[in-house]
Amino acid sequence: MERKSSSEIRRMYLDFFKSKGHIIEPSASLVPQDDPTLLWINSGVATMKKYFDGSVVPEVPRLTSSQKSIRTNDIENVGHTARHHTLFEMLGNFSVGDYFKEEAIHWAWELLTSKEWYGMDPEKLYVTVYPKDEEAKKIWLETPIDPSHIVKVEDNFWDIGEGPSGPDSEIFYDRGEAFNNLEDDDPENYPGGENERWLEIWNIVFSQFNHKPDGTYEPLPHKNIDTGMGLERVVSVFQDAPTNFETDLFLPIIHEVEKLSGKKYGENKESDISFKVIADHARAITFAIGDGAIPSNEGRGYVIRRLLRRAVMHGKQLGVNETFLYKMVPVVGEIMKDYYPEVLADQDYIAKVIKSEEDRFSETLTDGLELLNTIIDETKTKGSDTISGFDAFRLFDTYGFPLELAKEYASDKGLKVDEAGFEDEMQKQKERARSARSTEKSMGVQSDLLTDLKTESKYVGYDTLRVDNAILENVIQDGKLTDIVEPGEARVLFNITPFYAEMGGQVADQGEIRDANGEIVAEVIDVQHAPNGQNLHTIKALKKMHSGAAYTLEVNRAFHLKVEKNHTATHLLDQALRDILGDHTQQAGSLVEPGYLRFDFTHFGQVTNEDLDRVEKIINEKIYDEIPVTTVETDLETGKKMGAIALFNDKYGKKVRVVGIGDYSKEFCGGTHVKNTNEIGLFKIVSESGVGAGVRRIEAVTSQAALEFLNTEENLLKQTAGLLKSAQLKDVPTKTEQLQSNVKALTQKISQLEAKIAKSQAANIGDEMVEINGVRLIAADVQVSGMDQLRQMADDWKNKDQSDVLVLAAKIGEKANLIAAVKDDFVKKGLKAGDLIKAIAPKVNGGGGGRPNMAQAGGSNPDNIKAALQAAREWLESQNG
């Protein structure tokens, strides 16, 4: 078998199925779109759910893809096994109600064994089938496969709950006896068992049943094919690699780490684990950040942060102590450039995000080492020789400390780590994560009600907002097809419509339906795309309507024009942000309504007011320049050559629409727009904020809404001017600065007076001194305005010989505040301020702590301050009694 590169294997797979009438679907973003059940795209079929459950009908029923995916349920195994990865690619071919078992099996055999394609030795191939699936077995026997290489396996049935399910057939490659890690009589020593010899390279799922909510199965209205071939696995076969890590997908990264560390891969088992972890995690982090995810403390951002910190810690185990992971980005980009050119294009941004996170982790790591040293000291103080599993997990979860590193540090101090306890805590976290996630469903139960609506419905809303003599073709009311619309809510299809269906962030049109007499018979309240692409109207029927009758459809013109202005303004905003912030900004979501527009975009860092002013200025200049807005319908490749921006997560058909605003902006867009930018009138940013890790949001208004916003702002400014006794609006900033200066001066005077009062009280607290068993104690209730003054009094006490122990209490606002201090000589005798404060804080319904010589507490019951001071005296008696 001829050696092939990963790029050749990927391209050959896609080309093969393209030759069989499949459309190549580009790899979707790792960040799921419109699917809250998924944290990441975790398989090839995850992006096909809408097709398989019937909610959308694809333009062509045959699809193929190489889909990048992330799975994080077993991160700890990465580096320890031959094939565990966080990021992987899944090659797949899919049939949506088209071909089935016959073609899927024969094509699989052809691709694998034909000299024109993969050219694998047929004697090396084994397949498994579901015992009851005699049809699949019969078809396999039609191929030249050795009949003894067909194995029946009971669990060859793909089923993850409600939705499409069915038997599957797995294909294995026999790597030979040299890879066999089991004894001959081991029950797992067979194709399909847990072993290293027979490597699963492809799984073909025959989706032929609907798993219904009641647990029963029924035949699918439309049978599907869903297959998955792990690219990394197949590459290891073609490159005769012992594990996936010795292939061209990982080795360049490993070689780069060799240069940085001075260590060689393959010489030490423990070091090899670190090399593998870094290579795997670098790929996942690079692609995830490139797709818009950013390190954070929750969700997918937390996954990235955890992977990054794990890779950094493994770098330290290899002796790489400086920031280095960001240097892997161009290496990953070079490996994947044939199919993912965007990685190299975005490498500067991706590397910047990674380096920033590495720098932040270096600071965190210092805190982690401090915590570890504290844990070690506390463990020794307790007389124990074992760091608890809870503490070890706390280090791992908060600071990214691998268990191995914690064990190494502990060993240097003569301690060990409770590994079983650590694993228990790890399991608890996994359970918490599982319960926190939405229940994952691969697909909904397939319904043919909407899928079977094949009536053609032409959208003409780009050219007109009114259509006469539109024929009512289909009616869905009360969950069933009918010919008559009764008063109430219904969904209807017309043969032609001017109503825009919600898409691309633009809300649906609203309007009216009139009968032949001009009487309003229904209101259109929403429009959505049906599975076959028609505009499906949700209406509120006022009178009966009949299928086959002609009606006049009219869009609410005022509503529609406001939406158009905001949509074109959104395109201007998108380009202006790229001009000011950089090309790394990508649209992450939008909402275009008549009242305002909302635009989410990726950006790492804050957006300054100066930047927002520049963006706003550019957009208004383009409005005043009266630039024509044009639309061109063409094919995708021609559109790209025109310079049109494609949204990364959007899928485009054979025909696309390019919306151009002169030479300034070109985007693929199916929405409606003004004819000239001057129709927008005015653009004003209302707010800018962060809505997630690495995602910013701008809200803005245009036209009349922008003018109303500015009028409101001006009225507020006039009110402020009145309060400041300012005759001119332009004087408001100066007057405000004067007011702030006066407030600051008065605040300083108040602070000085309070300090004098505090000093006066500090001089008098000596009168409260009592001696208890040879220890002088001052326990006093004082009057201060803040905790800072209370601490200052305690600091002043340190330099005086008024007592050996001090307890001060004060009511500040509606809270009780306590502070305790112990002179160093008495700390050595065993009196600790932290113990004292913990003993008295409950009296005021509070708690606290601190160092042996200084501690503080707060409580919600200031009425019990006297009781707390008395408790201090009693505590001292108990300590010295």
UniProtKB/Swiss-Prot annotation:
Disulfide bonds: none annotated. It is an enzyme of class 6 (ligase). Keywords: Aminoacyl-tRNA synthetase, ATP-binding, Cytoplasm, Ligase, Metal-binding, Nucleotide-binding, Protein biosynthesis, RNA-binding, tRNA-binding, Zinc. One of its GO terms (molecular function) is aminoacyl-tRNA deacylase activity. It is found in: Cytoplasm. It holds the Pfam family tRNA-synt_2c. Binds 1 zinc ion per subunit. Residues 422-440 have a biased composition (Basic and acidic residues). It catalyses: tRNA(Ala) + L-alanine + ATP = L-alanyl-tRNA(Ala) + AMP + diphosphate. Its EC number is 6.1.1.7. GO terms for cellular component: cytosol. Zn(2+) binds at residues 567, 571, 669, 673. Transmembrane segments: none annotated. Its cofactor is Zn(2+). Residues 422-445 are annotated as: Disordered. GO terms for biological process: alanyl-tRNA aminoacylation. CDD domains: AlaRS_core (cd00673). NCBIfam families: alaS. Catalyzes the attachment of alanine to tRNA(Ala) in a two-step reaction: alanine is first activated by ATP to form Ala-AMP and then transferred to the acceptor end of tRNA(Ala). Also edits incorrectly charged Ser-tRNA(Ala) and Gly-tRNA(Ala) via its editing domain. HAMAP family: Ala_tRNA_synth_B. PANTHER family: ALANINE--TRNA LIGASE, CYTOPLASMIC (PTHR11777:SF9), ALANYL-TRNA SYNTHETASE (PTHR11777). Belongs to the class-II aminoacyl-tRNA synthetase family. This is Alanine--tRNA ligase.
